[in-house]
Amino acid sequence: MQQKNIFLITIFSMLCVLNCIPAACRMKGETSMEQLRELMVKNQIEARGVSDTRVLEAMRSVERHKFVPGHHIASAYEDHPLPIGHGQTISQPYIVALMTELCELKGKEKVLEIGTGSGYQAAVLSLLAREVYSIEIVEPLAISASEKLAELGYTNVHIRVGDGYKGMPDKAPFDVIMLTASPPKIPQALIDQLGEGGILVAPEGDYSQELVKLTKQNGKITKRTITYVRFVPMIHGS
């Protein structure tokens, strides 16, 4: 009888261990991703001069690996953009952080993003602003980004399929507008939808592109060039 009890206890213990293995693996995997995210912030973002503590915390919080295709997950926290299909990319982490810092978000802003892509930039913005409206011209990307953001609990992001050159006039004015693809020239429609005191951050240009920051004060636009960049071109609607 005692041997039988020992045998049953042994079997039970083995089952417990086996049941714990997947959970342990998941925990190890998540911990590893968290460590990679921390290294990304420290070595790629802080080291290059991004210092806004809210932006840094948002970059630590958003799980970038959940916004890239499965075969690129291992590269999610590396220092370069990644393809997401349909000729589009998820931007380099540093560029995401830099552009977000340039927006000077305090938490009460209504933001317009042109080019949802994977939804990663929108997720970062959602932690720093009141509402984020995002336009994506590639419908499959808009659908997958909407599903991913909902799944991860980013409830203040609103995605629409449409032409980014036209903006979203029914939701204007916006405190901040961000473009994640490069037009040859910043569309006047977007400048018109920028509210008084607002900020627009975007790449601009064809082959040679510059990251620019526009501010609107007393109805006048001031433009500042930040650095040279390389983004996918901004696509016109049909």
Annotate each PLM feature.
Residues K4-N5, Y94, A123, E136:
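Compositionally biased, intrinsically disordered low-complexity segments enriched
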Residues M1-I11:
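Bacterial N-terminal signal peptides that target proteins for export
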Residues C25-L112, A123-V124, L128, L141-I143, ...:
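Class I SAM-dependent transferase core
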